[in-house]
């Protein structure tokens, strides 16, 4: 495709979006359109199709690692950064939503905005290829004080230090916490060490007047709730 023809094609797909929105776009056309904003003077359709052929879905494209995206011919540092930034936007939006809501029902001590929480966790760590352990610290009014990436591990484990969590609870004057970690294997079944760690932290928090409300294992396809399964 000549540069003139390519420019005309870009304008046509942009015009299609301006007139009709995203409805009617194939997944590769969405990627093609996005890539026109970070890849100048180049036909982005083949790149978009190769991305979907390799990663199978838009979600997987946006959550793919820098190294994996680097294997796609035509993608450079700028375009990969652009795609990675797009992949982070949902978790930022969901995090902001959670900040403005009471996360725990005071009467039942259950999570009152679990759908948003699960969307946040799935977008933040559900697609990661190594285990990451998150702690959400809550105030006495059940509002989020802080989201913390507590530890980063390997493919099947992360090193979590309960003392560091207790120290943070004291410093923040948190009254409850929610734990979450991902399983890169996509198997949501808790391991023996997951259960033991959960029990240890729940017991230890009581010494500081705080509660463990929930522990969630998240993957890109599902989740496991310790609370729902009666393990807390």
UniProtKB/Swiss-Prot annotation:
PROSITE patterns linked to this entry: MPN
Gene3D superfamilies assigned: 5' to 3' exonuclease, C-terminal subdomain (1.10.150.20), Cytidine Deaminase, domain 2 (3.40.140.10)
Database matches in Pfam families: RadC, UPF0758_N
Domain MPN: 110-232
InterPro entries given in the database record: MPN (IPR037518), RadC_JAB (IPR025657), RuvA_2-like (IPR010994), UPF0758 (IPR001405), UPF0758_N (IPR046778)
Domain of life: Bacteria
Short sequence motif JAMM motif: positions: 181-194
Alphabetized UniProt keyword annotations: Hydrolase, Metal-binding, Metalloprotease, Protease, Zinc
Positions that bind Zn(2+): 181, 183, 194
SUPFAM superfamilies: RuvA domain 2-like
GO biological process, one term: proteolysis
CDD domains linked: MPN_DUF2466 (cd08071)
Molecular functions per Gene Ontology: metal ion binding; metallopeptidase activity
Family: Belongs to the UPF0758 family.
NCBIfam families assigned to the protein according to its UniProt record, in alphabetical order: PRK00024.1, radc
Family matches, as PANTHER family: DNA REPAIR PROTEIN RADC, UPF0758 PROTEIN YEES-RELATED
Protein's name in the database: UPF0758 protein FN0909
Organism: Fusobacterium nucleatum subsp. nucleatum (strain ATCC 25586 / DSM 15643 / BCRC 10681 / CIP 101130 / JCM 8532 / KCTC 2640 / LMG 13131 / VPI 4355)
């Amino acid at each position: 495709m000549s540069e003139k023809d390519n420019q005309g094609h870009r304008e046509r797909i942009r015009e299609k979006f301006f007139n009709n929105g995203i409805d009617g776009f194939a997944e590769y056309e969405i990627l093609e359109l996005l890539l026109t904003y970070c890849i100048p003077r180049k036909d982005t359709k083949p790149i978009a199709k190769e991305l979907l052929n390799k990663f199978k879905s838009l979600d997987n494209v946006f959550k793919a690692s820098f190294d994996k995206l680097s294997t796609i011919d035509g993608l450079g540092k700028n375009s990969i950064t652009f795609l990675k930034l797009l992949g982070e936007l949902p978790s930022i939006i969901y995090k902001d939503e959670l900040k403005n809501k009471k996360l725990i029902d005071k009467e039942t001590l259950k999570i009152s905005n679990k759908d948003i929480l699960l969307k946040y966790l799935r977008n933040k760590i559900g697609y990661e290829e190594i285990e990451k352990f998150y702690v959400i610290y809550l105030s006495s009014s059940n509002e989020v004080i802080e989201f913390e990436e507590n530890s980063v591990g390997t493919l099947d484990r992360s090193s979590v230090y309960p003392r560091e969590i207790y120290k943070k609870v004291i410093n923040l004057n948190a009254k409850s916490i929610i734990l979450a970690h991902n399983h890169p294997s996509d198997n949501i079944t808790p391991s023996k060490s997951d259960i033991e760690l959960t029990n240890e932290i729940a017991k230890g928090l009581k010494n500081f007047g705080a509660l463990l409300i929930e522990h969630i294992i998240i993957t890109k396809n599902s989740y496991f709730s310790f609370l729902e399964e009666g393990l807390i």
